[in-house]
Amino acid sequence: MSVTTGVVDLRSDTVTRPTPEMRRAMADADVGDDVYGEDPTVNALEETFAARVGKDRAIFVPSGTMGNQLALRLLTRPGDVVVAGARQHVVIYENGAAARNAGVQFHAVDDDDGTIDPAAVADAVDTAAHHHPRPGLVCLEDTHMPANGSPWPIERLRAVGAAAAAAALPVHLDGARLFNAEVASGTAAAERAAGATTVMCCLSKGLCAPVGSLLAGPAAVMERARDERQRLGGGMRQAGVIAAAGLVALRTMVERLADDHGRARRLADAVTERWPGAGLDPAAVRTNVVTWAHPDPSALVAHLRAEGVLAGTIAPGVMRFVTHHDVDDAGIERAVKALASAP
């Protein structure tokens, strides 16, 4: 449980607090004006991340949503359609930003298992021949949050990447929890992002940084990224103060994600024991997200809150737990106990 509040907060991994090492790094950060490209700590973070995901360059942005929207602006033109899974963050959790900011719409395809069929790319191209909008981009999400944070099988990632390449379409990888996928699969982030033109990753989820995400891609694309970031209001000044925490996150917080994954599996077992018909297979919980069906989420949320456990929903009738650095084994057992007596 949180050593700060005494509450077991499983609503999201965005509630994590910066570690003591991050706070020290933030206090001591060497800074400059990042809009001029003169913040050495931001520059170091961007270079570190780009190397980690196998791309030429990266840019630091305030949020994952901005990173995704920036990719859409860089890789599409107004009027395009983006081929994406129907439950992906960029499709349903960004307040319609794609239409507003990039002038695009989605060709949403089935992603119930957390992936999309490579054939969906060719289907979208074929559909466009019949007076439909032109496909301009394929967007993927790894891990796929609504599908219990499932990491894509690497063979499937490669197959979709190959299908996009055959159709001459760029690929954007929403890797908000990319390093959870790396740890769970044993496949390096750079390999997982190899078929993507651009890749975004959040530092402020399981990696515990207080704020910030990164978008990386080829030099030819990223040359325009600063201008597009400015149009979205994302230019920051002495951002090294927060970038310093991101450097610590990439250095110290990735391997320990395995602890979060094990704790999520413990919760999944408890949920299945309490509600065998909830549609949750504990074996499908490979990272830090647990989702299940419940007939009265508001009653369950209230019960858990009364027991000192915070949970949330992601859709009508769908509950969610997300494990993270700030919830330890004792916190998990408290949640398990609360579940046993839940309505």
Name each model-derived stretch.
Residues S2-A29, D33-H294, S298-E307, A311-V327, ...:
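Conserved PLP-enzyme active-site core in the AAT-like
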